[in-house]
């Protein structure tokens, strides 16, 4: 993809997404503990009676009884589709990070430094005048390249570049601990490629309005990027039809929970033989340049999906595949382009799908760019300002206490064998 566009990857999709949920829980738990080191939050009671709604009987509506007071104190803001205690942490954290970025815009950073890059990305996100003036210009070169793609190596190269930069067309890949040998890492291939994420949005009749709204979004994005309206509508319909067939091949959420069924090691030779619509040598070569090399096998999550995807790619006209890639690209890029692109994206993904009433303020959108692109550098800055050494010592002590308590609990279990206890203690 062209270096002109600053785009971010979509959230992890399908089974890979499910497998990373615990990491997010740990991240927010850590953030909560870090923020609790602050004197102000340390005084907050573990159970605040004002968060209850005592006017409701717990046996009638326990949720309202337990959280009614908190809900009254924290009304749902128009930019949210839901709001809970973790969202409070996220909101507080965003304010802190934004303060860091604002401070950086006031200093003279060394050219080429991380500070300068973070500052430039942040200011670029805030510059609505520039973004609206540029319109689709930042993505035109990439779109032109996509519309020249042919089946074979060129298609796989385009897919891989997009997977590394802006999304997961057709399928997703990732490296994580081997589920059968946690001491080694494995290369995973998982189903993906649906613009709306969930197969049910395409296949369930009750979601017909969403499916229509998605088609209208794609047509609008194609028009904004320079396609004639009639052609844009036809292309959008073709893309949705293609994704619907991809959804038919996709596993349901229930099927994705079957870990044993989702563990299917295959050699590279097997991949080439079974799923020959993809040029696996090209994919691995591209990955080896930037991310991971020496792949000799893959764990395929959903073999039947890949069989269906392989057949679908072979029988689909190249023009439809080009527009499909363009749709994947534009839905990822829309939030970082001009206001008309962002509004189109929000009207569908934010308003129609999620029930949000209002766009996120620009400062939050701007703040999220360097926070995503240069997250490790931002994290280092955050820790330096908000997590002093004394708080780290307290956190290490807390973790140590948890390990000790869990170890004692495991040792006292009468239903666990000694061998299993030993393995459990190792994991602590």
Report the location of each language-model feature.
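C-terminal motif of bacterial Sec signal peptides marking the signal peptidase cleavage site
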Residues: 35-36
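Active-site-surrounding "flap" and adjacent substrate/cofactor-binding loops of secreted or lumenal enzymes
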Residues: 57-60, 65-125
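Sec-dependent signal peptide hydrophobic core
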Residues: 26-30
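Positively charged n-region of N-terminal signal peptides that target proteins for export
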Residues: 17, 22-25
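Noncatalytic, helix-rich "gating/capping" subdomain that lines the substrate-entry/channel surface
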Residues: 105-396
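Short, Gly/Pro- and small/polar-rich lid/capping loops
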Residues: 41-50
């Amino acid at each position: 993809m062209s270096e002109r566009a600053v785009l971010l990857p979509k959230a992890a999709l399908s089974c890979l997404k499910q497998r990373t949920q615990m990491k997010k829980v740990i991240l927010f738990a850590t953030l909560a503990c870090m923020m609790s080191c602050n004197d102000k939050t340390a005084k907050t009671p573990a159970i605040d009676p004002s968060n209850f709604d005592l006017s409701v009987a717990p046996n009638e509506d326990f949720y309202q009884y337990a959280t009614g007071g908190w809900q009254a104190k924290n009304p749902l803001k128009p930019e949210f589709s839901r709001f809970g205690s973790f969202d409070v942490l996220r909101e507080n954290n965003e304010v802190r990070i934004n303060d860091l970025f604002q401070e950086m815009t006031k200093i003279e950073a060394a050219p080429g430094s991380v500070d300068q890059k973070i500052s430039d990305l942040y200011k670029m996100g805030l510059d609505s005048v520039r973004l609206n003036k540029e319109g689709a210009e930042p993505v035109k070169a990439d779109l032109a390249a996509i519309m020249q793609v042919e089946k074979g190596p060129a298609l796989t190269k385009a897919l891989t570049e997009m997977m590394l930069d802006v999304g997961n067309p057709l399928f997703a890949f990732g490296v994580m601990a081997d589920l059968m040998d946690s001491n080694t890492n494995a290369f995973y291939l998982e189903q993906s490629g649906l613009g709306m994420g969930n197969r049910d949005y395409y296949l369930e009749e009750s979601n017909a309005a969403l499916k229509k709204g998605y088609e209208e979004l794609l047509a609008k994005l194609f028009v904004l990027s320079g396609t004639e309206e009639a052609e844009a509508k036809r292309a959008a319909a073709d893309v949705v039809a293609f994704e619907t067939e991809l959804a038919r091949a996709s596993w349901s959420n229930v099927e994705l929970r079957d870990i044993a069924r989702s563990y299917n090691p295959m050699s590279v030779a097997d991949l080439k033989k079974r799923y020959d619509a993809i040029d696996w040598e090209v994919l691995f070569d591209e990955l080896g340049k930037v991310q991971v090399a020496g792949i000799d096998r893959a764990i395929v999550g959903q073999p039947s999906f890949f069989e269906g995807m392989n057949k679908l790619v072979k029988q689909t006209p190249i023009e439809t595949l080009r527009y499909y890639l363009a749709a994947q690209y534009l839905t990822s890029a829309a939030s970082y382009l001009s206001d008309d692109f962002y509004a189109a994206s929000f009207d569908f993904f934010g308003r129609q799908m999620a029930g949000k009433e209002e766009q996120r303020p620009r400062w939050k959108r701007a703040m999220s760019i360097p926070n995503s692109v240069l997250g490790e550098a931002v994290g280092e800055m955050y820790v330096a300002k908000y997590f002093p050494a004394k708080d780290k010592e307290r956190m290490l002590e807390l973790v140590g206490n948890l390990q000790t308590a869990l170890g004692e609990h495991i040792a006292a279990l009468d239903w666990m064998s000694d061998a299993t206890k030993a393995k459990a203690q190792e994991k602590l």
